[in-house]
Amino acid sequence: MCYTYQAGSQSARIDCYGRRFICECMCDLLRRQWHEFRLNLRPREFAYWFVQNLILLFCKLFIQTQLFGGEHYAPPAPATLLLCGHKRDWDPLLCAPRLYYQRGWWRPDSRRMAFVGREDMFLRGFMAEIVDSWEWPRWAMRLLDLTNLTPIVRPLRAYPIARALEYSLRSLLFDVYQQQGNLPLQEVLSEEMLDHLDRWATETASRQRRFKPRPSRQLHVKDILTWDYREPLMQNLRRRFLVPEQYAWYQARQRAKIEAQLQALGAVLRRGDTLWIAPEGMITPDGAQHRVRGGIAALLALAPPKTRVLPVNITYDFMTTGRMRACLSVGAPLEGLADLPRAELSARVLHALARQIVVTMTLLGSRFLWERLQQGQPDFDEAALSTAVAQNMRLLRQQGAAFEQGLQKDRTLQRRLRAFITYGLRSGLLIRLPGKQYRINPAPFQQRRETFFWLNPRYCVNELLTLEAALTHGERSIATTPG
């Protein structure tokens, strides 16, 4: 009941309505929190909710995340398919909690996000493959080779998808062992491969006294699924490695497996969840775009009719001091993709992904250094860097590019420029000269990294070139690299 007074009765009534509105908002907020709390206490949901909050805490401490285009994801939809450019291994883990808490920790989004990962992530020894070139101790690598991530990634709503490029001979032998049993190697591998294993075993025994080789024709599948035989089995599967019967079985098995995996992804969308998938099928190793995989068209055909398809891209600003920045950009929904021919579908998706690249100091600075090297002018000062970056920003702003937050302010830009130079000096990208001059070290641009390849400045240059091509010429201008 509202009480009014003779003096100031109108203001008192407005104040009463304001208090009532605040109370209703608080009650609505508490109802939302109670609903989420009850939902997240369920056994199947608790692990997902708990890990997402751990990831969110990690990002708050070590990564400064910026969200662009959150209004495209916020409205409810029957189902949402996120087509995301893939830059780092942790892209889906960063994307999920940021969109879940896009309106703040007290107003979580009730939608769950599933993501698609490479199939070998669900096999034993995947972690050993990831850290293979990190020069870890041998005992640690042996321990990782025995671990299986399936109990961890399954509660996070991870779904496998098979790709021939990542299917090794060892993966096939795991599949054979699970489906056909412990067969003799002679019934699986070709004579060429058996001879190769014998030669490798002899050479290894000459270097390692503990290794006791046995003729490969006396071994069974389980005998070589150990750490000792891991090295020769990690090469990509080839037809000549198998006997004809096993290769025919492998082809039929892959077709049935991929069909079942696509059906599982379609079921995720039919449940109304959000699905994260990389249309290029892998992490881009050079910053350029690769062709869209055919499975995207098949997945769109299985999705519900009103599925919302959103292009997403994450741009990392890591050439700085302090915390790395991650710019998560969500684009407007893509309509009518299921009706397009494959070539047109690929061009439209790649163009939409390229438009979501956010301009960062890392991209601008890398572009400047690369152009100076191409011009044969490796020496520069801070004023030259500042002038070139400001000019490039002006052109990109006119074309409608998005910039990371604060970069267009003069004071912030100067601070980012100094942080970029400091990073370059620490990482060996720049060499300090007398008189506040700097020289570009060309070696980091020429190195081919097997791990952490995204640290190469050419990676960042290719990202910016992809954005510029999309802004300038449209869909047909974006050159793709064969995947």
Regions found by a protein language model. Give the residues of each.
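Short glycine-/polar-rich loops that comprise or flank the Walker A/P-loop
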Residues: 109-113, 155-157, 273, 305-308
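Conserved H-X4-D acyltransferase segment
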Residues: 55-133, 178, 183-212
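Short aromatic/hydrophobic-glycine micro-motifs
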Residues: 63-64, 157-158, 377, 429-430
